[in-house]
Amino acid sequence: MYKLVLIRHGESTWNKENRFTGWVDVDLTEQGNLEAQQAGTLLKDSGYMFDIAYTSVLKRAIRTLWHVQDKMDLMYLPVVHSWRLNERHYGALSGLNKAETAARFGDEQVLVWRRSYDTPPPALEPTDSRTSYDDPRYAKVPREELPLTECLKDTVARVMPIWNESIAPAIKSGRKVLIAAHGNSIRALVKYLDNISDSDIVGLNIPNGVPLVYELDENLKPIKHYYLGDQEAIAKAQAAVAKQGKAG
């Protein structure tokens, strides 16, 4: 049996402000730093150990990983940074307040943009300052692969190459893997691992800063999965994530 641990970054400044973040590189709040530190302590106290970590190229996930490494005394851990683990790109919604957007377009439309599998938000114009074209962290990524918007289906397509080419082989080789990423890149992995339908994925909410453990068989098929920590608090956190896109 193999174990894989996934963790969504702690609360970010734009999580707190209820804004669509996507590829915008905002940092953690004080609460987000604390959530990441608590996750590291929980993993250490629960007896977890890791051989390699994967994260995105966005500082909220990277800093979350740093806190976990620090609390586990694993600062030496090899880390793979990949743009493929970035949050889903929210296109023209990037930076907008979720509740205000819902008040303007309606709860149902915003829920479709946020949570449906194959409907992306309106795309950025290629000349928009929010594009990633001139960002040095994407200098080696072909321009045509840099998104101007994404639905979850697009995010799955972006995430799967690093799973197939690097993460899955690492797990099968016996390495203990930790992934510190984002709500939708984790949803993409969970959809694949659990074979969740396109319609059911709409209801899946990933809380900030809570370790999600997968126990996998020899074919990397899930035996079971569970969150570490206070289950009542985790359920409340998931409900809060679900409520973010509503106007009320």
Curated annotation (Swiss-Prot):
Keyword S-adenosyl-L-methionine assigned: no
Q: Which GO terms describe its biological process?
A: gluconeogenesis; glycolytic process
List of residues binding substrate: 8-15, 21-22, 60, 87-90, 98, 114-115, 183-184
Question: Coiled-coil intervals in this record?
Answer: none
> Which InterPro entries does UniProt cross-reference here?
His_Pase_superF_clade-1, His_PPase_superfam, PG/BPGM_mutase_AS, Phosphogly_mut1
Q: What EC class is this?
A: isomerase
* Annotated Gene3D superfamilies: Phosphoglycerate mutase-like
Which GO-annotated molecular functions does the record name? phosphoglycerate mutase activity
Active site per database record: 9 (tele-phosphohistidine intermediate), 87 (proton donor/acceptor)
Catalytic activity field: (2R)-2-phosphoglycerate = (2R)-3-phosphoglycerate
One Pfam family of this chain: His_Phos_1
- What keywords tag this UniProt record? Gluconeogenesis, Glycolysis, Isomerase
Q: Where is the site labelled Transition state stabilizer?
A: 182
Q: Return the CDD domains for the record.
A: HP_PGM_like
Q: EC?
A: 5.4.2.11
Its UniProt pathway annotation is: Carbohydrate degradation; glycolysis; pyruvate from D-glyceraldehyde 3-phosphate: step 3/5
* Assembly mode: Homodimer.
Which PANTHER family would you find in this protein's record?
A: PHOSPHOGLYCERATE MUTASE (PTHR11931)
What does it do?
Answer: Catalyzes the interconversion of 2-phosphoglycerate and 3-phosphoglycerate.
**Protein family membership:** Belongs to the phosphoglycerate mutase family. BPG-dependent PGAM subfamily.
Protein name per Swiss-Prot or TrEMBL: 2,3-bisphosphoglycerate-dependent phosphoglycerate mutase
Q: Which organism is it from?
A: Paraburkholderia phymatum (strain DSM 17167 / CIP 108236 / LMG 21445 / STM815) (Burkholderia phymatum)
Q: Which gene encodes it?
A: gpmA
